[in-house]
């Protein structure tokens, strides 16, 4: 594997961990900051909203910034956001830190995908992008269970401290090993909005919105659900999250390989059909 792709996947893993680990420590945060689990769930809602709305806006506003430099800045802001989360004295401050984390994370994810696809040959783009998504899925396998265990051992603040240290290490690797990448030609916002007139693009956005909404609606409250409804122990819950993450990693690799082999359209159709079958089996 190209070490540059690995570093970008590691960056995706790091930011994915802070996005997803909240599910494993939500009940700890609620108890410590004296809010209900429902109120604590706003940490997920606000994060998702800022990520979705901030990503296109921030990328558009930073088109003149060299891509590696922008990635480094985003990672440093992400590190600062973790420090802020760790030191938050109340829920309001923690919620504000989630805004900072989501904004920086949105830039890191987009840049990781675009830089990875630009590093490899056209024939390997699908696998390179798949590796980035494997990094995000890897956050489910290692980041979430490990972050949950750290939270149970030393408190939820230690979880953010761990991710902050990891993100700083990744930032150093980006500065050392990734080459500079020219900024893409600036596309006016009006031209970008015109793409919404394309029914195929709108449908693709709709599929992504529905899929992510369904995924994070259940995932945000998976720990309290497994505790109260199925009476699972912390160890059993970590195992459930591990299986979920392993499936995500396998899907990222298979999806990237299938896109290169059979084309993106066919791969998407088969994937959506499998989703439909899984829902029917429920």
Say what each PLM segment does:
Residues 55-66, 251-263:
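Helix-to-loop junctions at the C-terminal end of transmembrane segments
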Residues 202-242:
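Extracytoplasmic gate region of multi-pass secondary transporters
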Residues 93, 122, 130-176, 221, ...:
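Helix-loop-helix hairpin linking two adjacent transmembrane segments in secondary transporters
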Residues 53-92:
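Conserved MFS/SLC helix-loop-helix module at the cytosolic interface between two early adjacent transmembrane helices
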Residues 34, 66, 87-93, 231, ...:
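Helix-breaking motifs and short loop linkers at transmembrane-helix boundaries and internal kinks
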Residues 70-83, 266-280:
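Structural signature of the two symmetry-related core transmembrane helices
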Residues 4-37, 55-58, 218-223:
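Extracytoplasmic
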Residues 97-135:
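Cytoplasmic helix-loop-helix junction between adjacent transmembrane helices
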